[in-house]
Each structure stands twice: as structure tokens, then as C-alpha cells.
Amino acid sequence: MGYAEKMGTRRAKTLVALIDGLDPEYVERSDMPNLKRMISSGAYTVGKAVLPSVTNVNNASLVTGRFPDQHGIVSNFHFDPRTGRSVMMESAEFLLRPTLFERAGRLGLRSGLVTAKDKIKTLLSRGADIAVSAEMPEPAFVSAAGSRPDMYSAEVNYWVFRAARHLLRRNDVDILYLSTTDYMMHAYAPAEAPSLEHLHRLDRLLGEIVDDHAHLGVLLTADHGMNAKTEGIDVARVLAAKGIAAEVVPIIRDKHVVHHQNLGGACYVYLEEQADTLKASEVLRGFPGIEEIHERAEAARRFRLRKNRIGDFLLLGACHVAFGALPAARQEIRVRSHGSRHEQAVPILCYGLGPDVRRLEYNLDLTRRLYHSRTVSTAKWSEGYRPSSL
């Protein structure tokens, strides 16, 4: 008899799990018997993350069930060309659409968020009845899940899963959003021993959560994949060499520099002079390693980004390329990172809920459908739902 049967669950629960950086190759190569059993008995596909393929953009998309043109989160880092000020995109004031927590509350449901990174809590927990981060845990969760873990370790993700289990077992929430951190994916390729151990232990913790609840619905996905980057490009230096002044923002940029050295596969370019637009476009299009160049209007339309929050250009790199501030315009680097189209593939799993994943193209489609499931029979998550497409 499982924990739920012993304690008397009030109603079925839903776990929305975003495993940061869980490239499908990690799933394929790892010993994860519980997840693979859920894949076999549930509904599974490999779908797409939202571009740019970074943490804030995709967590916001999953929490709101909307693309960035509606929710407003287009980067980890925001530059305002009118003021010249730069800030981390970590405040809820940037989020322009209701969260799943707010929607759940209107239906009389209790919701919670457990995350590794405190920035996810400050950005996305609006409306949650309970919100906790491993980075800055409250005393009650230290006693339940353990002392504050090292953010640059596998332990931080184990802490998140233990805290999630604690909340679900206490019957405090009907729906719980879980978000890990991708330090281990940045540090290790799928076949490396530390990665295999990390995911095997996460799988065991996931299995314990599922075993606790006879009717738990699980929606599991990732915010992006991961690739080895061997060539760095400093776009500001590339343009400056041709007499073009610009502010270049690596979209991956955040305070967790150890993860990725602020080097990622996508960047925004803000020109100092709009008269340089054509010249800059020609320079960038001729530079090896820059795979895609989209001017603001095209980028907003094609990738459903909020036009007034992106640069004059959106650049996407080749698979081996990362953009960022470097000592030279081009140099050899060694970092595992993401942000480009090459890190867009993500796993999409529905377990215990029953939707047809063939209709789910993007990770955010999981929460666009959430209250169409039987988990909360009185709820409708999205009226007139249609699968998203680009």
C-alpha cells in the first residue's frame, strides 16, 4: 500500500517537473528504470524547447503555458537600450501573463514551487501557496530535505526532489512545479560516470515520489539540451573591428558563471547607431560560426518573442559555437552550453494524465493542456486549445 492510500489523499495530484538541461541523449544513455517505465506506460515524445533555448525563457513558458511574445521573458539577462542599464531577468515584474499557480488558485487548488535556483522562485512563483529554493531554503525545508546544498554539485538536485516529496506527502499542494539546475549537464557529457550517477539517483527519487501517490499525474520535460562548445565568438569585437559600436548580450548570461562562463549559443545585438543596421548585417552574415541572423521584427515573428525586449539582431550559433565576452574576436573554448537551435530537442512525458503527446510539439504544450486532463475534473486549463506551431 502506497503512502497516499495510507494517509487518504484528498484528490489526485499533479507534478510538473522541469529537469534543467535534460537533453534526450541523457535519457537514452542513463540507467533510469523508473523514468523509462513511466515512458513505456505513459506517453512520451521528443519535442522542442522554446528559442532561445535557455532557462528563464523556458521555465516562464512552462509556468504560463505561453510563448515569450505573451509572457515577456526573452532572456536570462535584460539590457535596456534607452537607459543603458542591464539587469538579471529575475523579478516577477518582468512576467506579463498569469502563472499556473494563479490559475490553480482560482479553481480552489493549492500549488507549490520547489526549485534549485532562487531566481526561478523570484521570477515565477507568483500565486504559489508555497515556494522554496535550494539556493536559499527556509528552515522548515532544511529539516525536511537537508542543509543548504552546494549549488555547484549534484546534491542540489537531490535536495529539490526531497523537498518536493516532502510537500506532496504533507498533502499541502494539489499541483507542484519542480525545477532543477543543470550544473551536472554543463560539467559532464551523458556517458561520463558523474552524470550517470546523478541521473540514476534522481530517477530513484522520482520513483519514490510516484510510489507515494497512486494517482499522481506527472508532466516532465526540460528547458533545453546541451552541447560541447569549442569555438567562442565575441560579437562586439567582430563588429568593432569594422567600426560598428554595439552592446552584445549573451542570452544565457546569469550569476551562475561556473555553469557556462556566460558563453551560450544565442545573443542579442543592440546597435549604438541604427544607421549601421545594413553594414552590421553584412559583417555578421559573413562571419563563420554565426549560423542564423534575424533582425528584430523577423526574430519576434519567427520565434514568438516580445519585440520591445529583444535586440536589433538575434544571433544563433553553429552547434560548436558559443557567444560571449572574450579576449579576442574568435578563440578556442571548452564549455558545455546551450541557447541555440542545436539545444532545442527536449523530452516530453505525460504519465497518469492521458493526453496524446503526438499533439505536443513544444515543452510548454504540457501546461497548455494541463487542466484538460482527468487530474482536476473541474478545471479547464486553456479554452480552445490548439497545439502550438512555428
Regions found by a protein language model. Give the residues of each.
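Secreted, luminal/periplasmic, and some membrane-associated catalytic domains
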Residues: 30, 53-54, 78-91, 97, ...
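Glycine-/proline-rich flexible loop or hinge segments
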Residues: 15-21, 40-46, 54-59, 76-89
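Short, structured active-site-proximal loop/turn typified by the sulfatase FGly-forming signature C/S-X-P-X-R
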Residues: 27-69, 112
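Beta-strand elements within well-structured catalytic alpha/beta cores of enzymes
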Residues: 11-24, 38, 62, 104, ...
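Low-complexity, glycine/alanine/valine/leucine- and proline-rich hydrophobic stretches
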Residues: 317-371
